[in-house]
């Protein structure tokens, strides 16, 4: 009888701050920066959960996951909530920690990696956009928003940018051999809204 394949520590990366969102795996299999695997978008507007299921089709693949890395905004209200909900569910089911990453910082890194310099402009609704640049994140009217970087060129670089932003937390977990008290952190995901959702109180993300 052959022995089981050795476990490869893997992070599930989620972000819903813009567009179709980001679903990827980071396999920490000895390579200096790890090996990324992105979920294909099998059809337009496919939910994050379906794309995650495509990356993790069976118990064996899910058993490799040692933590969930989730972008917590600011960005699309609906997308951020979807990513946070999925991250919390996976972490609770597998009893693993959640690493929370500011989406705007990662978006700027991904923009730079794509060779662009324009601000990142994310649609928030019919009239508003979120402008992300070196000065921070702010709400602007669509009609007065600056020209934005090409989001399609940014998207392929986002998994690596999210992981880079979380490098210190990832290294700390690695030192402790991916062991934490539990996955209870999943219930404490704090979404950074750029402005209060309609009908709610809150502030501008800094």
Residue ranges of each PLM-predicted region?
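Oxyanion-binding and handling regions
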Residues: 1-32, 41-50, 99-206
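Phosphate/pyrophosphate-binding betaalpha-module
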Residues: 37
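N-terminal, well-ordered alpha-helical segments
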Residues: 46, 50-53, 84, 88
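Phosphate/pyrophosphate-binding loops at sites that engage ATP/ADP/AMP, CoA/4′-phosphopantetheine
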Residues: 52-67
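Short, well-ordered alpha-helices that flank and scaffold nucleotide-derived cofactor binding pockets
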Residues: 54, 88, 92, 113, ...
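Phosphate-handling active-site elements
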Residues: 59-63, 91-102
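Alpha-helical transmembrane segments of multi-pass membrane proteins
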Residues: 67-68, 106
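DPxDG-like acidic metal-binding loop motif
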Residues: 68-97
């Amino acid at each position: 009888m052959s022995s089981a394949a050795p476990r490869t520590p893997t992070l599930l990366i989620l972000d819903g701050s813009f567009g179709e969102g980001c679903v990827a795996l980071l396999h920490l299999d000895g390579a200096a920066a790890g090996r990324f695997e992105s979920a294909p978008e099998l059809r337009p507007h496919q939910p994050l959960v379906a794309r995650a299921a495509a990356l993790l089709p069976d118990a064996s693949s899910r058993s490799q996951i040692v933590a969930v890395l989730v972008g917590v905004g600011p960005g699309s209200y609906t997308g951020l909530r979807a990513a946070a909900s999925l991250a919390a569910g996976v972490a609770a089911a597998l009893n693993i920690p959640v690493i929370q990453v500011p989406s705007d910082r990662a978006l700027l890194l991904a923009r730079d990696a794509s060779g662009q310099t324009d601000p990142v402009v994310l649609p928030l609704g019919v009239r508003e956009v979120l402008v992300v640049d070196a000065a921070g994140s702010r709400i602007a009217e669509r009609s007065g928003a600056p020209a934005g970087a090409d989001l399609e060129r940014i998207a392929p670089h986002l998994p690596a940018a999210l992981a880079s932003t979380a490098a210190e937390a990832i290294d700390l977990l690695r030192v402790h051999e991916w062991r934490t008290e539990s996955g209870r952190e999943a219930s404490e995901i704090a979404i950074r809204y750029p402005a209060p959702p309609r009908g709610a109180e809150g502030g501008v993300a800094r």
